[in-house]
């Protein structure tokens, strides 16, 4: 995924499209992640997505659902933003 992407549009299981603002991209243990927030909604909660490749070699975004993996991404995110302040 290009590091200069500011927004992405994701489609849910019901076909509803939602635009997300990309907060940051993280490289952790040879995997890539993006942290996003819904662009037009007032929410304080970010969503962590892992960048994987499908069978055709195309990049796909997969929700981080495993607690251990999510905690690793959250810790890296918090460390990154605490250093910027």
From Swiss-Prot:
Disulfide bonds: none annotated. InterPro entries: UPF0473. It comes from the Bacteria. Belongs to the UPF0473 family. This is UPF0473 protein CLK_1946. It comes from Clostridium botulinum (strain Loch Maree / Type A3).
């Amino acid at each position: 995924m290009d590091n200069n992407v500011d927004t992405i549009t994701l489609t849910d299981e019901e076909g509803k499209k939602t635009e997300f603002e990309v907060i940051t991209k993280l490289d952790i243990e040879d995997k890539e992640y993006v942290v996003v927030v819904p662009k037009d909604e007032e929410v304080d909660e970010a969503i962590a997505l892992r960048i994987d490749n499908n069978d055709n070699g195309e990049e796909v975004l997969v929700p981080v659902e495993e607690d251990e993996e999510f905690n690793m991404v959250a810790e890296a995110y918090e460390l990154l933003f605490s250093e910027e302040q």
